């Protein structure tokens, strides 16, 4: 059972070290997920506020006198750009979250396969 295995870093780990790495790895997953979700929530809030500004700017373009149309259109364009940027940031963070969760899932599956191959009845403690 104390057989030495090679990790993905090409360093040799004992079963105890591998088990410790497994626990450390699973402890870090929620932190990354929490971080990404926090950023997604933040960007979504900014996006929602900017959409309100966008709606206000659109009403302003419709209701303003002809002499103020160019400046109102500029405000509308700026608001549209900002709104799109927050949407893009939210999407990028969601993609990062997906990639992190997928990579973590694959890594976790590799660790579980190793543990099950060594002891087929092994069930990790909750």
Swiss-Prot record:
One of its GO terms (cellular component) is Mst2 histone acetyltransferase complex. GO terms for biological process: chromatin remodeling; DNA damage response. The keyword Nucleus applies. Keywords: Chromatin regulator, Cytoplasm, DNA damage, Nucleus. It comes from the Eukaryota. Its main location: cytoplasm. The keyword Signal does not apply. It is found in: Cytoplasm; Nucleus. Component of the mst2 complex which is a highly specific H3 lysine 14 (H3K14) acetyltransferase that functions together with gcn5 to regulate global levels of H3K14 acetylation (H3K14ac), critical for DNA damage checkpoint activation. Component of the mst2 complex composed of at least eaf6, mst2, nto1, pdp3, ptf1, ptf2 and tfg3. This is Pdp3-interacting factor 2. It comes from Schizosaccharomyces pombe (strain 972 / ATCC 24843). The lineage of its organism: Eukaryota, Fungi, Dikarya, Ascomycota, Taphrinomycotina. The gene is ptf2.
